[in-house]
Each structure stands twice: as C-alpha cells, then as structure tokens.
C-alpha cells in the first residue's frame, strides 16, 4: 500500500505503532507483537507504479497549472481527443486491428444523409473518394428499403430482398460482416464456392428468399439465379452495385441490367438501384468524352450520378497525401541468367513451364537477375515435387501417342528440379537487381527509417503482376535487405487462384494477410490491383506505385489508400520515359476533368452543406458594424448572439421565459425578416432588408435591431446590455468541499457519563449476555455492568470468537429498569472485583476506590444467558457476592501441591512474570512429570530458546539469569490446560476467521497464580473490552444527537456517526486505512439523508420563494451544499463525536485510574477528518432522523424536517414539522382564476386515466405547459417549477423504496440502481405509457415529431415484450419490464411532464406525500420488482465503462483516473480566496492521455471518462498496445490498480440546472472483483498484521 497525503498505510501504521514498544514482562500486548508479526510479503510493484503515476501526474499538473486554471481549460470532448493525439504526432499512423464492426450507422455525415435521401427517391450512383463512406450510404438505403418492404409485407405484398453485388469473391465476406454489424436484419453472403452444388436447387433459393433480408454476393450469383428463374427481378427490392464503374460492355453488372432489369415492363416492380464508385469511368482512353462515358453509365444503370463538392470532400478526408515522383535510371533489356538458360535446355519446350519462362524473362529485365533466379527457386519448392510429377504425368496421359517423349520430359523435369535445388544462389547485390528494384529498396529504406524513430509505418507497394509481388516480397526477406530495412515486415497480396507456378494464393490466405496487416504483424504489402478497390484494408501512410497505374480510377483508388495524416503517395517513373511522364501528368488532368464534370452536374446532384456560415460567406452584401470606441465588430451572424444575450437581461416574472421571435416572409426579390422582442424590452421590433435566403433575412433583422439598441444606449461599446439583470448572487459560489482535505480534530474517547465520579447513592445494572453462548468455546455466564446513571438499551451486535458461523454470537445488553442502592462495603467489593478482572485477565493493575470508578463489573448468579429479567426489581439479588467476597479478601487461590484431582479442574491461571500467558486448567496429568519433554503441538513461548524444552521450563517464564537461580520442586503435579486467547477485538469478523481456537498445553503451577474469578465469569469478561468499546461509541454518538436536539435512537445514531475508513464516501475505491470491527458506517444513511435533504429544501423553496428554476437551484445549492453543512457541523462540535477509529486494546479501560503495573494505557484523542466526511455525517443524521420518524406508530417526517432545519440553518427552511410546509404555502394568483372548459376537460381525462380528480384544473394544466407555449394565452406558467418539485419527490420515493427493500446493499449498489429508476429513459417510458405526451402543450414544430417517434418506439418495445412473454408461455402482463433500456433517450419534455405531474399532484393534495407514494406504487414500482435485471444498467456510466474497456478488454493494469485540486486562478484572486477547480486526468502507463477541468472531482472525473470512452471505445486491443506501448500481463493485475483517485479532491456540488442521472462510481476492479470484495480483502490484510490469537 502506498502513502497518501502523509497518512501511513495500514502496514506502516502497524509497524510504527509497535516499533517504540519496550518489552514488558507484565504486559500481554508484547506477546501479540512477537508472535503476530507476519512474514515479509513480496514487494508490490503495483504500488510502486502507483506512486510513480502519482508523481508524474502532480508534475504534469504543476507544469500546466496556469493553462488549466484558465476558463477555457475545460476541454470539450473533441479537444480532449485532439490533446491526446497531440502528445504523439504519429498516433493516427498506428495500424488498426480488425475490431468488432463499428456501428457507423449511428453517426453519418451530412452529405451522406443527403445522398441517402436522394437515393431513397431515385436510382443513384454515388461518386465519392475511397474512404469517404460510400458503404454507409448503402447501409442507410438498405435499411430504408427493408423497412419499406416490411411495411409492404404487412399489407400482404410479396416479399422482396436486397442484393449487394461485389466484383470480387474476397469482398463477399468483408461486406457481409460490415453490413451485418450495421443492420438488425438477416444478412448472408454467397459466392461461387458456397453454391457450386446448389445451382439446380430452386428450393435453396426459395428458402433464402424467406429467411434473409440482404444477400451479399458476387454479381455472377445473382445473374445465374435470374437466368435459371430461381428468383425473378420483381422479387428484388434493391440492387447495390459496388464499384459500379465496371458496369460496361459485357460485364456481369451490365448483363443483369440488360437481360433482366429491362425485361420487367412494370417499372413499379423493378428494384431500386444504388451504385458506388470513386470514378464514373474506368478506361485507359484519354480521349474519351467524360460526358459520353458518364451518360452511358447512367443510361445503363438507369441512375443519376451524385457527388459532393471539393470543399466538403476535403472536410471528410482531411488533406490528400503528398504526391512525389521518384525516378530511376532507364531499365535496359537483360539477357537470361545462366540458370534460366540451363533450365530452358531441360524443360524449355514443355508447355507447363512456358508461363514461368515468360515471367523469368520479364523479371530479369524489370527486377534483376537475382529475382529471375529466385522465381525458379519458388517454382521448384520441395513441397511442389509431387505436384510437378502429377502434372507432367497428367499431360502425358492426355496424349498417349507421345508416351516416350513424355517420359523424357518427366526425366528432364526431375533433372531441372535437382538443378534448382543444388544451384548456388548469390545474395542480392546492386548488380543483380534492376535500377527500378534498387530504387524501390532505397525508398523503402528511407520510409522505414521513420519506424526506427518511433513512427509506425504502414505501406503498400502496388505492382501489376502477381509474380512481381511475390518476388519483391521474397527479396525483402533476404538478410542483406533486412539489414538495410530492419523494421520492414512484408507479405504479398494478390488475387485468388494460380498465376504460374509461384504466384498463387487462396481467399483464406488473402483474408489472413489483410488481418495481419491490420494487426501490425505486417507493415508492408506488395499488392496487385486487388488492394486498390473493395477490400477493407486500413489506411496507410506510404503508398508506392512500383508499376504506374493503367487508368485514372486506379490512380484515385490507390491514392485513396493513403488516408492517414502526413501520408505519402510515391510514383516510380523511369527517367526519360515519355510514356511515364505523360501518364504522370495525364492522371491529374483526367481527375480534374472528372471533378469538373461532376461539379458541372445540376445543383441538386451536388450535395453541399447548407450552413449559416456558408450563406453569409457567399453573400458579400452583408454588413459589419464597428463600434468607434472599442472597435468591437457586429456581423450578421454575431447579431443573433448579441440579441439573445440582451433579451436574457430583461426583467421577467418568475415563471416567464423570454425569447426572441423572428418572422421571415417571401417578398419581391427574396425574403425579408422582422424581429420581435418581449414586452419588457425598451425597443420592440425591427425589420431587415431583402435578401436571397431566409437565413440572411433573419440575420439582417437581428442586425438592424442591434444597431437600434446601440444607438439608443441599450448596448455598450462592447455590445453588452446596459440593462444588467441581477443574477443570483451565489450562482458561482464555491460551495463544494474536498473529501481529501483533512484536518486534525479533537475526538471524544469517553462518554460524558463516565466523567461522573465520587460518592454514589445508587447503581443501575445492565446484564451482558450472549445470544449463542456456545460460540465462545467455553461455558460462560452473564456479567453485570453497574453504572451511576441508567444506560439505554442498544441493539444486539455480533462477536466473532473463531472461524465459521458457529463461533459467532450476538451480545445482548439488557438494562434493568430498577436501580439499587448499595452499601459502602458492597461498593468496595464490586470495585475490588472489577480491579481483579483488570489485573488477572488483562494484566493491568490499577489503584482505585469505589468513588474513582465510573462503572463496575459484577459476577452474576442464578441466571443464564437466556434468562428473562423483565420482572427483576432488585439487581442485588443476581450478584454473586461470594465471588466478590473472595476477590476482596485474597488475590489468589492457595496452592499446597497436594490437592485432590478435583482441585485442578476449571480454574483460571495467570503468569505473574509474563502478562501474555493465561490458561484455563482442565485436569491433572499424573502420567506426566515436570522433567518430561513438552508434547508435540504445544504452542511455544517466547522465552525458552536457551533452555531444555521440558514441561517445567515451559511453565517458568523467567529470563535466563532469574531462571538459573530458581529451584523448582521436581515432584509437583502436571496440569493439562488450554492457552487463553489474547484477541480483544472480537468485533472483527476477519480477525475471528484467522483464530485457531483453544490450544492445549501442559503446566506446573509453582510459579503461576490461580485466580479467584470463576472460569465461566472469566470467559464472559473476555468479551467486555469489545462490548464497552461499542457501548462507549454508542453513548458518544447519542450525545451528539442530543446536543442537536434530535431524538434519534442510540443504535441509529451510532451508524450515522461511524466512519470506518479515510475514503468511506468513495465507493468506487478500495478502502484506505480501513478500521475493522466498527459495524455499519454512515454511507447508507448519508445516501438516504442526502435525498431527503434535497426534497425538503425543494419543497421549502417552492413554497416560499418566487423565482425561476435557475434561482431555485442556486438557493438549494446554498442550503444543501457540503460547505454549509460543514460550517454548521463545526460550530456544533459535531466532528468530535464522529467515530473514526476501531477498537484499541489499550484505550478501552475506564478513565482516571492510576496504573500500578502493566503497559501504560494510551489516550488517542485526535483524529483526521476530511471536510466532506463531516458534511456527509450531517446528511447521515438527517437520514437517521428520517428512519426514526418513519418507525413511529404513525409514520411521519417531523424529526427529519427538524434535522434539515438544524443542519442547514437556512432562512428558507425554518420548518420544524411536515405540516409547516403547507401551512406556509400561499396560492399564487394565476391559480385563482376560474378554469376554462379546456382545462376542465383535461381534468376529466386525467381523472379517468389516473383515478384522481384535481381540485384545481389550472394546476394540472400547468404540469403539461411546455416553456415554448406563450403564457399570455392562458396565463399559466410553464411546468418548470413543478418539475423541480416533482423531481425531488420522485427521487425520494425511489430511494426510500430501494433503501427499505434492500437493507443489505451498499450505497454504490443503491446509486447504480437508482439511476435506472429516475433516468430520463424510464420516466419518458412511464409518461408515454400513461399517455401524458398527448396532453403536452407546446409551440415547437420539431418537438411533435420527436415525441411521436419516441412514443411509437417505446410502445413498440413494450408490445414486443408482451408478445415475447406470450411466446415463452407466460401471461402477457408478466412481460419483462426492462424493455425501455434499449430505447434511446427521449425528448426532454417527456420525463419533465411526468415529474411536473407528480409535483402538481403533491401540491393539489395539500402536500400529501402519500399521494406520491401511491403514484409510485401503481406506475413505477411494478417495473422494479426484480432489481437484478438492472444490474448492468450502470455499466453505461462513463467511469464504469472506461474502466471496463481499459482493464478488462485491453488487459491494461497501468490505468488511472486521477484528480487534483488547483487554484481557480493561479494568477489572480484564486490565490487569495482559496477558490479551487479540480482537474481530472486519464493516465495510462504514466502519461496523461486526456484531461478535464470542473468545479468538483465528481464532474471532472465524469468529463474525462467521457473523453476517454470516445477515444478508446472503438479501439482494438492491438492498436491500444501499439499506441501506448502496453505490455501488461494478467499477473500484473493483482487488484492494486483500477480507478485510482488522488486523495485530495472529490467535491460534490449541487446538480446542474437540469438534473442528470446521478453519476455512478466505478465498481470494476481489473480482477473482476467488486469494491465490496476489495474492502473485505483489504480488511483481511490489515488484520493479518494486527493482533491474533496464537504464537
């Protein structure tokens, strides 16, 4: 464990606690220290890594503190991504692994939508560059067509399906996977190999038609289906032609259209056509007319070409690669090599080798002699011997007349094989390579030298011939070349099938090669034209044309492979070759001609982005006004902003929403706009000039109004309003406190009750007994705790005596109702008994009289652990006075060495020389002698290393010198005994699990003392330290509540005041400095109290304060902010009563006693608390008050309301009881107006639907009044105030339900599942289910469509869930209630009106909370009867999501989300005021990858997690490892990592204006363990190093 903020880790804390101890023979504590010290564990490198990350993060914060403190430091999601990439200029050039297919359908670009919309209306050919998303448009269109077809089938029409046609078999699987990942419909892929045996099976294709929606196949498949009439063209709804430029002449694309498409006379039955290509023509003819070629393509496909402008294209692809030409010396014709000549003599006339000889003759000139010889080596591979024989034999079999000649050819072929195998191939040298090949090696060496510098290179070398690709790859594998280019990892990619004897491959091999290229295993492909189009090859940063392209489209497509930033497109041309020079320039000319032609298409066929900026930029008539004094400028576009800001400063009624209204009407010459300002504006309207577009007309009107306002002095020289609206004064106040900012405070260690000493007149008894007495190993009887004042009864709590449930027992602390007036003798007697217990059992010898004791212990008699004492009047009757008398008269039992056997049974023995040795005698062992060896298994003492291991020496604990002078009796009897346990913290379950139980030993009693206390009393007295610790903590907690005037039961008070770790409030982190055995902490109560505090202050604000929703939020922030709670807690000294330390074996004794012998007791009266922890305790006390009030015979909220008033000291919350809320409510004026008929009708409809009739219909109408609806129509404000109220009410009722239904769940679980219950998705679902959306009143044109769409969607999901239940054999009403999770977020108004309705219901019923509970029970609770179905809902939260991605998906163990406080303004007032911001960063392998700045740690972590999710969600593990150099192994993840947070910043301010779903905190550990498991594991680690039972 590492050290945070100067706090010692548990290991070090334990060490420091013991290091300064001195050996004390009279102390039992020393033995614990000696025997419980664990073996050193292995060094924990993870903790070292954490500390290194912490240091790196703090250094980064310091280096960037000024920039982070600026207002603009809070980055947007995009800027966070840019920042991440800016740290490594080559990040985007890393190879990209094949990942689960991206759902690109979710975020199309604007031009894609426009092309899609066009394709929906008519047949279209989309002309777009490689990598610009043509397939996405096709998928959008496919989905649209399928949806249309589904609708048509519903009407009884014949089923039709979609065909996606590709030109290459290799593209079938690729496009099938891509489409299947982006469509929720059945998709299959077919090519010749899959249906070769099915051509005569019509049934196969009939089944295909019924089961599939999309078929991806080679065009030949569809053609043959249509040809054989397995399908007809009318059964096809859409045909997508990939690489549509192939549709010419007799290509199968063209034949499908000519032979089948045109044969269907009914145009309505013809399928829609969509073509995709990078260029509409594919020809080498440079003289061809683009108009004619494109016209032919359009005519053939019966489609229109559509494209996008160059400007939008550049926005998509960024910048094109930098094109360069590398020239090589002229290649001269070379003679065949010696190997080739010898082989020609042997097999030169055989037709099987003709193609290889042709390739070798080409290679010797084009590539060089080495490559020509290498070709023969590749042809005559060892594994090809059998194939060669078979092919020669096959040739001979086909011509029986040439048997002799064939035999001779076979012999020659074998001789040729032997020649090649024995040939000595020279290494590739400059002389054996052509100038062209040599130039390629130079280029590759130059490019891959960047890889050595840390820049990843992905390269494709395009060639024309298959054998060229194979030979170049073989060349680069040679040691001589690898020395020059060590980072190159090559492979060839060629078309499937055979190309001579060397260049062949399979489709499977193609896929593997491309996959390895994505993975980064290969970084250089030598490829033929197969890599130019279609195949999903990741973008590269180097593309080399070894052989120049033959057509313009090849040029465009191969260039399109270089899509990365700072890419290079290299053309290799022969020096002085006019043909190469012509093609070098002609391709650019041809491309530009194609672009010019496409841009010359009609305007409706060029998709351009219609933005305001474009409209303004294209119109030079717009005006710019420059303010003379400040030089501020006012443009058309900015005038819209200036006007909106001005209106925001106008005075308004609390419920009034001010806005700017525009009217644009067509006039002669264009459009003219007019602007209208609210009635409170000094100027009401202005009219602009006539412009060519509506947008310009609107801007002109705003511009004219701004000029009028400036001229009338309503705008200053900086174009700011002079009518300053007074915003809420504390809107930007720093209200949060840090959970990591810790201070040392005084801590109450003893209750005030113990301070009362002196003469006493009466005593009150509390019986301490066990519910399961058998758990304690030994028989026991209750003991009595006698106090000067009556003690309250506390709830039972568990003690853990050992391992397993059988060793667990609850303690019952039963106060007796009647006091007892003891005599002086009796007081001194029980005082002596108490001191005897301290001396004999706990090795502490105190000097005290009865007047010094705050409490006494007394043995019991005549009662057992389960005895009913309710009728007992006088406690004196159950005290064992005989035992008291014995302890008063003598401190030990006399021993004469000749006692009978019965004497040695059931007595308690202590060692006066070693306080750690206590024993329970069991029986005498006459068969053993003191000189006998100690039997095996006896626990070894600490002081007999240098003595003989006899029973006598075992019994004597003197040091060596003292032992030598001691003469022991050799005839004394040996006693069998059991070693008494030294464990004191019986409250700690983990410590109990480590207990070994009773241990047998053998003693002689000469040097030991036999106690007067009976064994059964001793056993119960052993439990007293744990009991008194819990009792004292309870009393101190109760005192805190009494000081605040809150009558909270003692048990609940203790829970509310208990903080058991330094980061109790951080549920997503492993506990730090965990204090075991303290019982329940305040977390659950704080969760409950926080929610009630929000509800209570919301009701008070709605009741008393007239203001808008923003002002409500500000006021509520002031009331419930942690800073406010902290201040009042400190004023009340609440921090002194917080219980933050676990049981300490040295501090539980009564205060004020004089210690005569034994280790000195410690006084630990200080503790360090975080500011937020103190504020959390305040909320926990509110939660405790709430539970107390709800537990009354008549459940109410009065005590909780009083607690809110006490804790907040707010001027807006002075209520002492629930009834005070409604008593303070005054009906607003707008509710006093008689309702209209429309409002009454709404009231009736809601009555029929909901069962409740509103007393005030106008209040109900208000719940459905959208802010866009003008108030002057009905003089009813919008629902925003009611929504503010209803939001808090629904939060409270949901939290109350979860809290009571799941008493064993921690706040982390409660928060995560509350997210589901109060999410906008769910509330929107309920609103639609109740039909509330039909009652919404608004004036937003787009809102209606959004509501309708979402309502239909959620209704459909509900119906599907019902049908699924029926299909599963369930009742329809038992459908799965989590169907709404899959629905996207609704329009915001839908959850708003649900909350507003609940708020209105609450107000209309006179603040009757039971009405809210009734609404919850009927309409919300049924969805959450089984909460387990929402267990994964929280995984959508960014912090949880990114943690899962990095640690689980990527397996990285060096990931941190860290936060740090910084001054709000390091150069200004922030240094003076102490105002802070919080910066959160995502650190991976010690570097900050992205960051965010916010007002609190909670929101900063949320923001940076969103950035990280955006970056890493679609990244593959391989790309992650390459990008960050991650080499983490599974064993690295030992649970000591995950979401680590700097322990200095975690502020929690009030929620933003619109509530968001409460951010869940991450619970994912990289080991898959929950935080609860981590806490338990941490607890065990701590207890391993604290006191334990045995030596």
UniProtKB/Swiss-Prot annotation:
Intervals of motif DEAH box: 242-245
Listed name of the protein: Dicer-like protein 1
Family per similarity comment: Belongs to the helicase family. Dicer subfamily.
Gene: DCL1
UniProtKB keywords: Antiviral defense, Antiviral protein, ATP-binding, Helicase, Hydrolase, Magnesium, Manganese, Metal-binding, Nucleotide-binding, Repeat, RNA-binding, Zinc
Keyword Cell division found: no
Domain of life of the organism encoding this protein: Eukaryota
Cofactor(s) required, per the database record: Mg(2+); Mn(2+)
GO biological-process terms attached to the record: defense response to virus; regulation of defense response to virus; siRNA processing
Keyword Disulfide bond: no
InterPro entries for the chain: Dicer_dimer_sf, Dicer_dimerisation_dom, DSRM_2, Helicase/UvrB_N, Helicase_ATP-bd, Helicase_C-like, P-loop_NTPase, PAZ_dom
Annotated positions binding Mg(2+): 1283, 1392, 1395
Organism (species): Pyricularia oryzae (strain 70-15 / ATCC MYA-4617 / FGSC 8958) (Rice blast fungus)
Entry-linked SUPFAM superfamilies: P-loop containing nucleoside triphosphate hydrolases, RNase III domain-like
Stored Gene3D superfamilies: Dicer dimerisation domain, P-loop containing nucleotide triphosphate hydrolases, Ribonuclease III domain
Its EC number(s): 3.1.26.-, 3.6.4.-
Domain Helicase C-terminal: 439-607
Ranges where the PAZ domain occurs: 888-1012
Domain Dicer dsRNA-binding fold: 639-729
EC class name: hydrolase
